[in-house]
């Protein structure tokens, strides 16, 4: 696989409001293991959409892995205005999404709901698969994108769920 889209729950969805929460280290350890597998299979591009939570933690892991693996990181934001109203701490995280190998904005500003459909279609057409932290038992707005991914032909979907995190937690405590 050449390009992998990374999406998942936000920190708000997960009830994580502190980066020092043990859940963050479990999630990042799981991300690292999965990303290394993708990279060793030849992954060339990791693509983000600029969301906080799972995506941001995956971005941090990906940037660390760039020291040992040769691959590119890109962020394709839905709008140029994405994150402009975030607090100072989250602005720093937003800046991190912009300090990657490739940055693009799908639209200048929000005008209508159809832009989200076009944006999602663009992401699916320009990546070969996705790594998504999503559990069908804990639905969020991600549900619709995951359904689109699964319906796309020749598109690989790798779901990370709470069971995977439990396995990582147990390994950490062995």
Curated annotation (Swiss-Prot):
Organism per entry: Lactococcus lactis subsp. cremoris (strain MG1363)
Name of the protein in its database record: UPF0398 protein llmg_0513
Family membership: Belongs to the UPF0398 family.
Domain of life assignment: Bacteria
């Amino acid at each position: 696989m050449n390009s992998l889209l990374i999406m998942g729950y936000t920190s708000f969805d997960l009830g994580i409001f502190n980066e020092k929460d043990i859940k963050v280290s479990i999630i990042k350890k799981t991300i690292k293991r999965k990303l290394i597998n993708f990279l060793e299979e030849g992954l060339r591009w990791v693509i983000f959409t600029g969301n906080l939570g799972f995506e941001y933690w995956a971005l941090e892991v990906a940037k660390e892995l760039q020291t040992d693996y040769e691959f590119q990181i890109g962020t394709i934001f839905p709008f140029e205005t994405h994150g402009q109203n975030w607090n100072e701490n989250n602005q720093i995280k937003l800046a991190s999404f912009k300090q990657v190998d490739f940055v693009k904005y799908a639209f200048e500003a929000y005008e209508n709901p159809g832009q989200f459909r076009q944006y999602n279609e663009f992401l699916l057409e320009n990546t070969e698969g996705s790594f998504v932290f999503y559990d069908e038992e804990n639905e969020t707005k991600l549900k619709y994108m995951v359904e689109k991914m699964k319906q796309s032909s020749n598109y690989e979907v790798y779901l990370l769920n709470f069971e995977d995190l439990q396995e990582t937690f147990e390994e950490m405590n062995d």
